[in-house]
Amino acid sequence: MTAVISGFHTPVERDCLEILLRGRQPLVICPARSIAHIRVPMAWKKHLEDGRLLILSPFESKEMRVNATLAERRNRFVALIARSILIAYAALESRTEPLGLDLLQQGKTLYLLDHQTNNHLIQAGGCLISKRLQAALLGLL
């Protein structure tokens, strides 16, 4: 079974995590900070004990607060270990755009929602997710 890996930081990502925790697939949570002193939410504890959930971070213990730079570094870390990546929104000149272009240059499979903000990444070689999957994802939002 394929693991789902994400920072699960934004409100939408946290909603997705809540749904994924009800499933059976392995999950990897990568906060954009150190996990040295992390308080594990009760909802995660059983999944950690069962070996279904892993909390992973590339950051040293001094990196205690999430910021844009750490989030960008975390996103690159997640992309490095992921086989395929879903980007929902990558506007031109956003912080996500260069990551998407780099992933395509590295030969990673990059999935994108069918939205005008992603057209440049689609034209660069990104893959549209199916209409059915997109409808299911948008139903979660």
Which residue ranges define each predicted feature?
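Glycine-biased, small-residue-rich flexible motifs in mid-sequence functional cores and linkers
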Residues: 1-141
